[in-house]
Amino acid sequence: MTDHSIPRFCEHTGEALNAAALALVREATSAERVEQNAGKLPEDSILKKVPIVKLAPGTWKYVLIQLTRDGEDGAIVVVRSYAHCAFHADNFAACMRELKEELGGKGVRGRVLGGGRVRHDAESKRAFVYGYSKTFGRTPGCNERAAVIIEREFDGYETGWSDDGY
C-alpha cells in the first residue's frame, strides 16, 4: 500500500509520481506575484530574520528559493540544502516547513528559481555548486547565482560553480 499523501519522485527523471508530489511541484513553481526587486524589503520585514544560506556538510541537492511575504513589497533569495532530502522538491518543502515553524506562518511564500547540487566542506571553507534539478529543470544562471550568494554569506569561503553534471 502506498501513502499518496507523501510526495514521491522518480529516481531517474525527477518526475512527480503521485498527487502529493505534483502539488508540491506546483506550489514550488507557482508565482502569484513575481518580484524582480529581491532584497529590497521594508526595514521591519520578518524576512530579514531568515538566514540566506543553510547548507548541510557533504554533497547534496540544493534549491534556490525566492521568498516573499503577503502584503509586503520585496523579496529575498535563499539557498537551501538539507542532508535528509532526497529530491529538490523535498528541500523546498523542508525550507517552507522550517520557516512556518520559526516564523509562525506569517504569510511567507516561496518559489523555486532552480537547483542542482552543492558540495560543501565546512572544515576547509569550500563550496562548489553544479548540475541541475530534474524536477525543476535547467535554469540558466542558477548555479552561478547560488555560488555568489554562498560566498557573500559565508565569510572566508572559496566557492565555485559549473553547469556541468547532474
Question: At which residue positions do the language-model features occur?
Answer:
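Intrinsic low-complexity, intrinsically disordered or marginally ordered coil/linker segments
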Residues: 1-166
